[in-house]
A protein has these predicted regions:
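N-terminal intrinsically disordered, low-complexity, charge/repeat-rich segments that act as generic
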Residues: 1-17
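Short, conserved turn/kink motifs that form compact alpha/beta structural patches or helix kinks used as
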Residues: 12, 20-121
């Protein structure tokens, strides 16, 4: 029986989709990212919450961007700063690289945090 506060997953979390560009080689042999038909990876039971840009807060100004954060209990293989994310039907840009939370004293892996942003309006 799982404890009601089981921290191995977020049982009431949401489903999000990681979007990664397809990569093609052009006529010159260079790799080119193609966002026309991105590769989609689905993640379930993700915690999502609104967050703020630290840069804007430090400067004391409002941002032109809306910021959210996602917490994953499972590994997020392939996620990086170039990914886009579909959350509640809206596409967001990654805001930096994923952050893996690992407790230095106990070795507990708390999960992965991914910050995203999108232009307001």
């Amino acid at each position: 029986i799982r404890d009601r506060y089981d921290m191995t997953r977020f049982p009431y979390g949401e489903t999000v989709v990681m979007l990664q560009p397809a990569v093609h080689v052009d006529d010159l042999g260079d790799k080119v990212e193609d966002w026309g038909n991105p590769v989609e990876t689905v993640f379930h039971n993700v915690a999502i919450y609104a967050s703020a840009s630290q840069e804007d807060e430090a400067a004391g100004r409002d941002s032109d961007y809306e910021h959210w954060s996602m917490l994953f209990k499972q590994p997020v293989v392939g996620a990086d700063y170039r990914c886009r994310w579909r959350i509640r039907g809206v596409v967001w840009e990654a805001d930096g690289s994923p952050i893996v939370w690992h407790h230095p004293m106990s070795g507990w892996d708390a999960g992965t945090q991914i910050n995203v942003k999108r232009k307001k309006g």
